[in-house]
Amino acid sequence: MASASTTWSMSCLKSALPSIQPISSSSLRFSCGPSPSRLRICKPKSSSRLLHSFVGLAPLHPLLSLSSQDSTSFEHSFTVIDNGGRVFAMRHGRKVPKLNRPPDQRRALLRGLTTQLLKHGRIKTTKARARAVRKYVDKMITMAKDGSLHKRRQALGFIYEKQIVHALFAEVPDRYGERNGGYTRIIRTLPRRGDNAPMAYIELV
Protein backbone atom coordinates (compact mmCIF):
# COMPACT_ATOMS: atom_id res chain seq x y z
CA MET A 1 0.00 0.00 0.00
CA ALA A 2 1.39 3.38 -1.02
CA SER A 3 2.18 5.89 1.68
CA ALA A 4 0.48 9.27 1.92
CA SER A 5 3.65 11.05 0.78
CA THR A 6 3.81 9.15 -2.52
CA THR A 7 3.05 11.41 -5.49
CA TRP A 8 0.98 9.69 -8.14
CA SER A 9 1.85 10.57 -11.71
CA MET A 10 1.40 9.12 -15.17
CA SER A 11 4.83 7.51 -15.04
CA CYS A 12 3.78 5.55 -11.92
CA LEU A 13 0.66 4.32 -13.69
CA LYS A 14 2.63 3.29 -16.77
CA SER A 15 5.13 1.39 -14.65
CA ALA A 16 2.30 -0.75 -13.25
CA LEU A 17 1.31 -1.90 -16.74
CA PRO A 18 2.94 -4.97 -18.34
CA SER A 19 5.91 -4.17 -20.52
CA ILE A 20 5.30 -4.29 -24.26
CA GLN A 21 8.12 -4.67 -26.73
CA PRO A 22 8.10 -2.04 -29.46
CA ILE A 23 7.67 -3.27 -33.01
CA SER A 24 10.30 -2.07 -35.45
CA SER A 25 9.44 -1.05 -38.96
CA SER A 26 11.80 -3.67 -40.43
CA SER A 27 9.78 -6.52 -38.92
CA LEU A 28 6.62 -5.51 -40.78
CA ARG A 29 5.93 -7.09 -44.14
CA PHE A 30 3.19 -6.21 -46.60
CA SER A 31 1.31 -8.75 -48.65
CA CYS A 32 -0.70 -7.64 -51.66
CA GLY A 33 -4.11 -9.22 -52.03
CA PRO A 34 -6.30 -9.43 -55.12
CA SER A 35 -6.92 -5.68 -54.99
CA PRO A 36 -3.87 -3.39 -55.07
CA SER A 37 -5.68 -0.81 -52.92
CA ARG A 38 -5.90 -3.17 -49.91
CA LEU A 39 -2.77 -3.77 -47.84
CA ARG A 40 -2.47 -6.02 -44.82
CA ILE A 41 0.09 -5.54 -42.10
CA CYS A 42 1.37 -8.82 -40.72
CA LYS A 43 2.84 -8.50 -37.23
CA PRO A 44 4.92 -11.20 -35.59
CA LYS A 45 3.25 -13.14 -32.81
CA SER A 46 3.92 -11.75 -29.40
CA SER A 47 3.17 -13.09 -25.96
CA SER A 48 1.32 -9.92 -24.92
CA ARG A 49 -1.46 -8.74 -27.25
CA LEU A 50 -3.27 -5.43 -27.17
CA LEU A 51 -7.04 -5.54 -27.18
CA HIS A 52 -8.80 -3.61 -29.93
CA SER A 53 -10.56 -0.52 -28.68
CA PHE A 54 -14.30 -0.03 -28.99
CA VAL A 55 -15.30 1.59 -32.30
CA GLY A 56 -16.85 4.66 -30.77
CA LEU A 57 -15.79 7.75 -28.90
CA ALA A 58 -13.08 5.88 -27.01
CA PRO A 59 -9.33 6.56 -26.75
CA LEU A 60 -6.92 4.20 -28.46
CA HIS A 61 -4.94 2.95 -25.42
CA PRO A 62 -4.74 6.31 -23.63
CA LEU A 63 -2.33 5.26 -20.89
CA LEU A 64 0.08 3.68 -23.36
CA SER A 65 -0.03 6.48 -25.91
CA LEU A 66 0.23 9.25 -23.33
CA SER A 67 3.69 10.40 -22.46
CA SER A 68 4.94 12.91 -19.94
CA GLN A 69 6.36 15.13 -22.70
CA ASP A 70 3.13 15.26 -24.72
CA SER A 71 0.37 15.26 -22.10
CA THR A 72 -1.85 17.62 -24.09
CA SER A 73 -2.37 15.22 -27.01
CA PHE A 74 -4.81 13.00 -25.10
CA GLU A 75 -7.84 14.41 -26.89
CA HIS A 76 -6.24 13.73 -30.30
CA SER A 77 -6.40 9.96 -29.71
CA PHE A 78 -10.22 9.94 -29.91
CA THR A 79 -11.83 8.63 -33.05
CA VAL A 80 -14.11 10.95 -34.98
CA ILE A 81 -17.70 9.79 -35.46
CA ASP A 82 -20.06 11.23 -38.08
CA ASN A 83 -23.56 10.57 -36.75
CA GLY A 84 -25.26 12.51 -39.53
CA GLY A 85 -26.53 15.27 -37.24
CA ARG A 86 -28.04 18.40 -38.71
CA VAL A 87 -28.04 21.89 -37.23
CA PHE A 88 -31.25 23.89 -37.57
CA ALA A 89 -31.56 27.65 -37.24
CA MET A 90 -33.12 29.20 -34.17
CA ARG A 91 -36.37 31.16 -34.24
CA HIS A 92 -34.79 34.60 -34.00
CA GLY A 93 -37.11 37.55 -34.47
CA ARG A 94 -40.29 35.44 -34.35
CA LYS A 95 -41.47 36.31 -30.86
CA VAL A 96 -45.17 35.85 -30.13
CA PRO A 97 -46.62 38.23 -27.51
CA LYS A 98 -48.05 35.87 -24.88
CA LEU A 99 -49.78 38.61 -22.80
CA ASN A 100 -49.75 36.26 -19.79
CA ARG A 101 -52.62 34.20 -21.20
CA PRO A 102 -53.13 30.79 -22.83
CA PRO A 103 -53.68 30.73 -26.60
CA ASP A 104 -57.48 30.67 -26.55
CA GLN A 105 -57.80 33.52 -24.05
CA ARG A 106 -55.13 35.51 -25.86
CA ARG A 107 -56.99 35.23 -29.15
CA ALA A 108 -60.26 36.27 -27.48
CA LEU A 109 -58.53 39.29 -25.93
CA LEU A 110 -57.07 40.40 -29.27
CA ARG A 111 -60.44 39.95 -30.99
CA GLY A 112 -62.11 42.11 -28.34
CA LEU A 113 -59.48 44.84 -28.58
CA THR A 114 -59.73 44.85 -32.38
CA THR A 115 -63.51 45.14 -32.22
CA GLN A 116 -63.40 48.02 -29.73
CA LEU A 117 -60.73 49.91 -31.66
CA LEU A 118 -62.65 49.66 -34.94
CA LYS A 119 -65.83 50.70 -33.13
CA HIS A 120 -64.54 53.72 -31.19
CA GLY A 121 -61.46 54.68 -33.22
CA ARG A 122 -59.31 55.09 -30.10
CA ILE A 123 -58.82 52.99 -26.97
CA LYS A 124 -56.50 53.03 -23.97
CA THR A 125 -54.74 49.82 -22.97
CA THR A 126 -51.33 48.59 -21.90
CA LYS A 127 -48.41 49.15 -24.21
CA ALA A 128 -47.87 45.42 -24.76
CA ARG A 129 -51.50 44.86 -25.75
CA ALA A 130 -51.46 47.88 -28.04
CA ARG A 131 -48.42 46.59 -29.88
CA ALA A 132 -49.94 43.11 -30.14
CA VAL A 133 -53.34 44.25 -31.47
CA ARG A 134 -51.88 46.58 -34.10
CA LYS A 135 -51.14 43.67 -36.47
CA TYR A 136 -54.72 42.41 -36.38
CA VAL A 137 -56.26 45.84 -36.93
CA ASP A 138 -54.07 46.40 -39.97
CA LYS A 139 -55.07 42.98 -41.27
CA MET A 140 -58.79 43.76 -40.93
CA ILE A 141 -58.38 47.05 -42.78
CA THR A 142 -56.43 45.32 -45.55
CA MET A 143 -59.27 42.80 -45.90
CA ALA A 144 -61.77 45.65 -46.12
CA LYS A 145 -59.74 47.28 -48.89
CA ASP A 146 -59.98 44.05 -50.88
CA GLY A 147 -63.76 44.05 -50.54
CA SER A 148 -64.36 40.48 -51.73
CA LEU A 149 -66.96 38.19 -50.22
CA HIS A 150 -64.28 35.79 -48.99
CA LYS A 151 -62.48 38.57 -47.09
CA ARG A 152 -65.77 39.78 -45.64
CA ARG A 153 -66.52 36.32 -44.28
CA GLN A 154 -63.03 36.11 -42.78
CA ALA A 155 -63.57 39.46 -41.04
CA LEU A 156 -66.96 38.29 -39.75
CA GLY A 157 -65.24 35.30 -38.20
CA PHE A 158 -62.79 37.52 -36.30
CA ILE A 159 -64.69 40.69 -35.33
CA TYR A 160 -67.41 40.17 -32.76
CA GLU A 161 -69.99 42.68 -34.05
CA LYS A 162 -71.45 42.22 -37.52
CA GLN A 163 -72.40 45.88 -37.99
CA ILE A 164 -68.77 46.96 -37.53
CA VAL A 165 -67.69 44.65 -40.36
CA HIS A 166 -70.23 46.07 -42.80
CA ALA A 167 -69.36 49.65 -41.83
CA LEU A 168 -65.65 48.86 -42.13
CA PHE A 169 -65.98 47.45 -45.65
CA ALA A 170 -68.05 50.46 -46.69
CA GLU A 171 -65.76 53.18 -45.28
CA VAL A 172 -62.21 51.82 -45.65
CA PRO A 173 -61.82 52.07 -49.48
CA ASP A 174 -62.41 55.84 -49.38
CA ARG A 175 -60.49 56.50 -46.17
CA TYR A 176 -57.40 54.32 -46.71
CA GLY A 177 -57.43 53.84 -50.46
CA GLU A 178 -54.10 55.63 -50.99
CA ARG A 179 -52.40 54.26 -47.86
CA ASN A 180 -50.48 50.99 -48.07
CA GLY A 181 -50.02 50.36 -44.37
CA GLY A 182 -49.61 52.01 -41.00
CA TYR A 183 -53.29 52.42 -40.24
CA THR A 184 -52.80 52.79 -36.47
CA ARG A 185 -50.83 55.06 -34.16
CA ILE A 186 -49.58 54.28 -30.62
CA ILE A 187 -49.19 57.18 -28.16
CA ARG A 188 -47.57 56.46 -24.81
CA THR A 189 -49.13 57.91 -21.68
CA LEU A 190 -48.67 57.81 -17.90
CA PRO A 191 -48.29 54.38 -16.29
CA ARG A 192 -51.26 52.78 -14.61
CA ARG A 193 -51.84 53.56 -10.96
CA GLY A 194 -51.40 50.52 -8.75
CA ASP A 195 -49.08 48.19 -10.64
CA ASN A 196 -47.23 50.90 -12.62
CA ALA A 197 -47.88 49.10 -15.91
CA PRO A 198 -46.91 51.14 -19.00
CA MET A 199 -50.05 52.41 -20.73
CA ALA A 200 -50.66 53.73 -24.23
CA TYR A 201 -53.38 54.99 -26.56
CA ILE A 202 -53.85 53.24 -29.87
CA GLU A 203 -55.94 55.02 -32.50
CA LEU A 204 -56.77 54.85 -36.18
CA VAL A 205 -54.89 57.28 -38.40
Swiss-Prot record:
Compartmental location: Plastid, Chloroplast
Pfam family, one: Ribosomal_L17
SUPFAM superfamilies in the record: Prokaryotic ribosomal protein L17
Gene Ontology CC terms: chloroplast; cytosolic large ribosomal subunit
Keyword RNA-binding: yes
Keywords, comma-separated and alphabetical: Chloroplast, Plastid, Ribonucleoprotein, Ribosomal protein, RNA-binding, rRNA-binding, Transit peptide
Family that this chain belongs to: Belongs to the bacterial ribosomal protein bL17 family.
Function: This protein binds directly to 23S ribosomal RNA.
Protein name: Large ribosomal subunit protein bL17c
Record lineage: Eukaryota, Viridiplantae, Streptophyta, Embryophyta, Tracheophyta
